[in-house]
Amino acid sequence: MARQALRSTLWLLPSILLCFPFCLPLSGQHVTELPGVLHCGLQSFQFAVNLSLEAESPVLTTWDSQGLPHRLKNDSDCGTWVMDSPDGFLVLEASYSGCYVTLEGSHYIMTVGVQEADVAGHVAGTRQRLLTCPLALQGKAPDTPNAKVCSPVPVKERLPCASSTISRGDCEELGCCYSSEEEGADSCYYGNTVTSHCTKEGHFSIAVSRDVTSPPLRLDSLRLGFRNITTGCDPVMKTSTFVLFQFPLTSCGTTQRITGDQAMYENELVAIRDVQAWGRSSITRDSNFRLRVSCTYSIHSIMSPVNMQVWTLPPPLPKTQPGPLSLELQIAQDKNYSSYYGTDAYPLVKFLQDPIYVEVSILHRTDPSLSLLLEQCWATPGSNPFHQPQWPILVKGCPYAGDNYQTKRIPVQKASDVFPSHHQRFSISTFSFMSAGREKQVLGGQVYLHCSASVCQPAGMPSCTVICPASRRRRKSELYFDNSTSISSKGPVILLQATKDPAVMLHKHSGTHADSPTLWVMGLSASMVITGVLVVSYLATRKQR
């Protein structure tokens, strides 16, 4: 029984250790998945993450088998290396035999995370990722290029990958395309991708197609050794479609790292983007391209490369993606929309018929093809958008025609920090709700503003444009307001009725409730007292004389 219990404990131990990073350091914190690109090498993890999307001062962290956090840094004793890139990406490499990697069955596992801090500097949450790589990667051959990579290359644009006498198997082992059908053409050639390998002579060989990016890559913008540019590192061969770099392991900014009985050589291939300035704006038509390659050799001989790995720049986040629509309704302080009232400024105080400048905008989106459509806007005396009574402001995107003081739509001007199609602006004249009875009394004197809106694509097209007035609008079936989202003002607007009569203002705001006869008697009495005092003073003066 004791042996059986011991076996059960040993069997459960990896799972218990795996649970520590999730349970101990993160109790009471909000945990979400950390996005990034993982590559499984023969000896290590390689994980690239864009920390510019995380907190202001992100810290890459891991947890040991006891659940204790450790800040990741360059530490050869623990087998971790952290490298920054100018584009904001951080590349972590962690050896499978390092301090923070656990062997779980047939996989190596490691937990990494980025801790996020609040305004006070306290840890508010963690974005976390469990890295897993299979155990058996030795002897893995390069992927054979598929037809999509090989077929589009014209015969006259082919860049030879090896001699014409090479066999199909040896050609594909280099990661190259093979074809013996075209007479006089190179049978082994590079495909429309990045092809790299380590030679027995101790050289890197890297071929890049212009079609690996969209828009196509400017091949003359590629540079080797981004951190240490040296001479003699130009391409050895170049066509209008391909460029080929071949250089020794000890040149062109290559870095070397010794781990055990193996030496790893690394270099980078970077496209320098052409940025043109005009006024206060800068533009570029070049793609973002960054490539890191490594060759691993035995320190006893370079005749047999152990491993070749390539890390490309992680793809950018999509500009268009499904998700909740976040809107904001703000009231501007002036007609130029130069500033807005904050939450602490509510309730706002306005006089009847004064303009209120309203803006509804999309939050957390940077896609210029999105267009914000306002469907309905209305006012209620309470914060509940379904509260009664309601007064329409916009109906199907157009000012409500039944109002004597019609709402005015205000165009959004282009600005460096504003997508015009993400904003809708209008001004309204303030009003008060009246009771439904014959006396028509003012109800409460405050209103809340509400709008329902949706997003349309592409911006600027007739199908995404509201035309007013109704007589000029397209047929009803041509414009849809599906899946609309509602938004309300941050607080109420208190409406006052202005008056220019000081007597009325005095009567309204005085603390007495006396009626007119009482005021008349009090005034007469005061006059008689003042007259009596004056007469007595006059008689006393004459008597002294």
Swiss-Prot record:
Residues 540-545 are cytoplasmic. Residues 1-28 form the signal peptide. Keywords: Cell membrane, Cleavage on pair of basic residues, Disulfide bond, Extracellular matrix, Fertilization, Glycoprotein, Membrane, Receptor, Secreted, Signal, Transmembrane, Transmembrane helix. This is Zona pellucida sperm-binding protein 4. Disulfide bonds join 377-451. The ZP domain is involved in the polymerization of the ZP proteins to form the zona pellucida. Proteolytically cleaved before the transmembrane segment to yield the secreted ectodomain incorporated in the zona pellucida. GO terms for cellular component: collagen-containing extracellular matrix; egg coat; extracellular region; plasma membrane. GO terms for molecular function: acrosin binding; identical protein binding; structural constituent of egg coat. Residues 29-518 are extracellular. Glycans are attached at residues 50, 74, 228, 312, 336, 483. SMART domains: PD, ZP. Residues 472-545 form a propeptide. It comes from Rattus norvegicus (Rat). Expressed in oocytes. Component of the zona pellucida, an extracellular matrix surrounding oocytes which mediates sperm binding, induction of the acrosome reaction and prevents post-fertilization polyspermy. The zona pellucida is composed of 3 to 4 glycoproteins, ZP1, ZP2, ZP3, and ZP4. ZP4 may act as a sperm receptor. The chain crosses the membrane at residues 519-539. Residues 148-192 form the P-type domain. It is found in: Cell membrane. It is a single-pass type I membrane protein. GO terms for biological process: acrosomal vesicle exocytosis; binding of sperm to zona pellucida; negative regulation of binding of sperm to zona pellucida; positive regulation of acrosome reaction; positive regulation of humoral immune response; positive regulation of T cell proliferation; prevention of polyspermy. Gene3D superfamilies: Spasmolytic Protein, domain 1 (4.10.110.10), Zona pellucida, ZP-C domain (2.60.40.4100), Zona pellucida, ZP-N domain (2.60.40.3210). CDD domains: Trefoil. InterPro entries: P_trefoil_CS, P_trefoil_dom, P_trefoil_dom_sf, Zona_Pellucida_Domain_gp, ZP-C, ZP-C_dom, ZP-N, ZP1/4_Ig-like. Belongs to the ZP domain family. ZPB subfamily. Residues 197-471 form the ZP domain.
